[in-house]
Design a protein with these regions (language model features):
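N-terminal small/polar loop signature for handling phosphorylated ligands or for N-terminal nucleophile
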Residues: 38-48, 54-118, 203-261, 409
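Short glycine-centered, acidic/aromatic-flanked micro-motifs in structured strand/loop junctions
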Residues: 57-60, 190-192, 262, 345, ...
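General beta-strand structural signal in soluble alpha/beta enzymes
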Residues: 6-7, 57, 83-88, 108-109, ...
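Gly/Ser/Thr-enriched, mixed-charge loops and adjacent short helices
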Residues: 1, 43, 119-243
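Phosphate-binding and adjacent anionic-ligand microenvironments
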Residues: 246-247, 283-460
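An N-terminal, well-structured beta->alpha segment
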Residues: 1-74, 78-79, 158-188, 394-395
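Buried hydrophobic positions in well-ordered alpha/beta secondary-structure cores of metabolic enzymes
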Residues: 9, 57, 94, 107, ...
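Proline/glycine-rich low-complexity loops and linkers
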Residues: 93, 137-170, 174, 263-337, ...
Length: 460
């Protein structure tokens, strides 16, 4: 059954509109706290901090984060759960600290790459992994119950963890496994998207020996992801060329994704980085299982991996589905074109800083530039058009006769040298129209024609 609030990456929306209101966040904290305590009582939760169950709450740099932090804190306290507040910290840092502190769960206040007017709440399990669908369903069911405050002697307590950033920085450094000399002599430009990694990411690379210049490192609560970060790598590319840097690293607002730029200012996306991670592990004898991409992964990635006898599988779009497929197939590396990359031999969730370190380590081991490392991936032309639709209308539109007929015509024209994909966004009222093939003009023409058909059908 479809969930009312939880999407593919937690709960998300416009601040001040349901469900992103302070009263909802208060109730959400209480409901989640009750569900987690019930799990603990039933013996379904192993990790808890001594005699006082706790959760870790972190956030990115959005102005609204303060409001939701306070509301969630109050909700958990009302349920009788202690709260560890870690402040602005990358999403994967909260996953790591959840395990470190043996908390019942981790809670992240962020809307990832979205603008400041949006925000969201997502949860990590005690193991630092995305919360299971069944637990999210239990939380939604608990939201239907009236909020009942625990007794005055059983209320949760809250405290700030001053060592959170330092702990996370040390964790990131431990995953690098660089050759002797670390990153000495490497010149980096790091774009922190005015987001959660503005303090941690530059420090990680500096402490490993790199020369680091930063952009997008002055958050004011309103400028997160604003013309910067992984969704706007063109500014990073300009800075890399201007400074004569070796590599540029672009994170997003909550720093769970990473896009890179080579020394010539060419953007290197998640598909190309995923190839580099997979080939490096193959050469070091540490690759296990297939590499997992998504339905949106470029055909060029699949062909490059095939040429190296590396198995490739596609999952539904969303890092949680990539994770599930990796676990099911015994794989360790996977990801999305957007830069959500999973290195399960290093971390339990996507981590932009850790992913960048893995690529830099591969460059050092092979004594190659970033451009040379990803050169085997010859990307096929791909056009993606987002069509705004009514909420819940995606299934009806995709089943509409005129849409299906248009898709069939394009597929017949492309034959076995291209792909067509229509899929709804998991977080926004959009239907994504993607066409991929060998000829850029033909691909673009087909994508625009399909998008027009979808728009007309949506307006009918």
């Amino acid at each position: 059954m479809a969930q009312r609030y939880f999407g593919t990456d937690g709960i998300r929306g416009t601040v001040g509109e349901t469900p992103m209101t302070p009263d909802f966040a208060l109730h959400l904290g209480w409901a989640a706290g009750r569900v987690l305590l019930d799990q603990l009582a039933r013996g379904q939760s192993e990790a808890h901090n001594a005699a006082r169950p706790c959760v870790v709450i972190g956030k990115d740099t959005r102005l609204s984060g303060y409001m939701f932090e306070s509301a969630l804190e109050a909700g958990f306290a009302a349920a009788g759960v202690d709260v560890l507040l870690v402040g602005p910290l990358p999403t994967p840092g909260i996953a790591y600290l959840t395990r470190t502190f043996r908390a019942l769960a981790g809670v992240v206040i962020s809307a990832s790459h979205n603008p400041f007017a949006d925000n969201g709440v997502k949860f990590f399990s005690q193991y630092g992994q995305k919360l299971a669908d069944a637990v999210e369903a239990d939380i939604e069911a608990m939201l239907d119950q009236p909020l009942v405050t625990a007794g005055a002697d059983a209320l949760g307590r809250a405290k700030r963890v001053e060592s959170a950033s330092g702990r996370y920085i040390e964790f990131c450094k431990s995953t690098a496994r660089l050759p002797e000399g670390g990153l000495r002599g490497v010149h980096l430009v790091v774009d922190c998207a005015n987001g959660a990694a503005y303090q941690t990411a530059p420090e990680v690379f500096r402490e490993l020996g790199a020369t680091v210049h930063t952009i997008g490192h002055a958050p004011d609560g309103l400028n997160i992801n604003l013309d910067c970060g992984s969704t706007h790598p063109e500014h990073l590319a300009e800075e890399v060329v201007r400074r004569g840097a070796d590599v540029g690293i672009a994170l997003d607002g909550d720093a769970d994704r990473c896009i890179m730029v080579d020394a010539a200012g060419q953007v290197v996306d998640g598909d190309q980085l995923l190839f580099a991670l997979a080939e490096d592990r193959q050469q070091t004898g540490t690759l296990a299982g297939p590499v997992v991409g998504t339905l949106m992964s470029n055909l060029g990635l699949a062909l490059a991996l095939e040429a190296r006898d590396i198995a490739f599988e596609r999952a539904k779009v969303g890092d949680r589905y990539v994770f599930e497929r990796l676990v099911a197939l015994g794989g360790i590396v996977g990801g999305e074109s957007s830069g959500h990359l999973l290195c399960l031999d290093r971390a339990t969730t996507g981590d932009g800083t850790v992913s960048a370190l893995q690529v830099l380590a591969a460059m050092a081991r092979r004594e190659q530039s970033l451009a040379a490392l990803v050169a085997p991936v010859e990307k096929c032309p791909q056009t993606l058009i987002n069509v705004r639709i009514g909420r819940g209308a995606a299934s009806t539109l995709m089943a509409a006769a005129e849409v299906r007929e248009a898709v069939q015509k394009v597929e017949q024209d492309l034959g076995n040298k291209g792909r067509v994909l229509l899929r709804p966004s998991g977080t926004e009222p959009l239907l994504r129209v993607m066409v991929e093939g060998l000829d850029a003009d033909r691909v673009d023409r087909h994508a625009r024609a399909l998008a027009d058909v979808v728009e007309r059908s949506a307006a009918a």
